[in-house]
């Protein structure tokens, strides 16, 4: 669309007086546009579905990928605590509005359409339990020639309050348009997760593609002990059973 789109979830109120707020409102997804990250458009409500009642109260945690001319987004329904997938050729098209209580009504006369609901639900999460609910998803394209044969990956946080391991549970698909996602936690053992000082593992993040040279710069700046000396191609000759000298 020629601009960056920045989006987030907000609870909206009629005025700025916090003392006048007698109860929480529901989460709505909101976006602004910018081309310089200095000046931003006025906020626009993007997803407006009142899911109050039951377990939650709105829509949060959108992640988006563009495939050809189509945008795919996955986000959390706070009522069912589940992940849903939609598609559109118009990224900033809004759905829902005042009084809209369900996604079927929200999508009527909208540029967005439903692709999948309850993504991953009921599958073994690969960490000894079942994927029941998730949040903070991160949708990203597989590298060209990915050895696993997948087209896109989806990392979703399954917190302990969703009977999960408190970190990402990976999923994958061979066709993002199908909405068919397979949980592949067995391919990403916990031992391979980075861990911070309090034992926490990755969740609610974003995966960004980088070139090998960019990755080298990141290592040099933040992990010099494991940074390689060069990313240039090289060749070496050796015999069977003897490690090459590089």
Task: Kindly give the residue locations of the regions a language model identified.
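Carbohydrate-active catalytic/glycan-binding domains of CAZyme proteins
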Residues: 1-227
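Short, solvent-exposed loop/linker segments at the N-terminal edge
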Residues: 232-245
């Amino acid at each position: 669309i020629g601009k960056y789109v920045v989006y987030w979830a907000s609870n909206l109120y009629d005025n700025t007086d916090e003392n006048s707020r007698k109860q929480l409102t529901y989460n709505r997804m909101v976006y602004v546009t910018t081309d310089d990250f200095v000046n931003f458009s006025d906020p626009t409500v993007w997803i407006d579905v009142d899911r109050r009642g039951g377990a939650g109260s709105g829509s949060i945690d959108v992640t988006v990928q563009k495939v050809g001319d189509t945008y795919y987004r996955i986000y959390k329904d706070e009522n069912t605590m589940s992940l849903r997938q939609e598609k559109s050729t118009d990224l900033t098209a809004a759905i829902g509005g005042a009084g809209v209580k369900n996604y079927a009504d929200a999508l009527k006369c909208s540029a967005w359409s439903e692709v999948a609901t309850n993504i991953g639900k009921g599958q073994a999460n690969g960490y000894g339990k079942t994927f029941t609910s998730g949040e903070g998803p991160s949708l990203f394209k597989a590298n060209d020639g990915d050895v696993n044969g997948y087209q896109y990956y989806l990392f979703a946080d399954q917190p302990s309050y969703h009977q999960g391991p408190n970190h990402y549970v990976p999923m994958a698909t061979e066709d993002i348009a199908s909405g068919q996602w397979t949980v592949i936690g067995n391919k990403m053992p916990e031992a391979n997760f980075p861990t911070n000082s309090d034992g926490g593992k990755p969740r609610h993040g974003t995966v960004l593609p980088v070139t090998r040279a960019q990755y080298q710069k990141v290592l040099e700046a933040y992990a010099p002990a494991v940074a390689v000396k060069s990313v240039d191609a090289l060749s070496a000759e050796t015999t069977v059973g003897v490690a090459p000298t590089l």
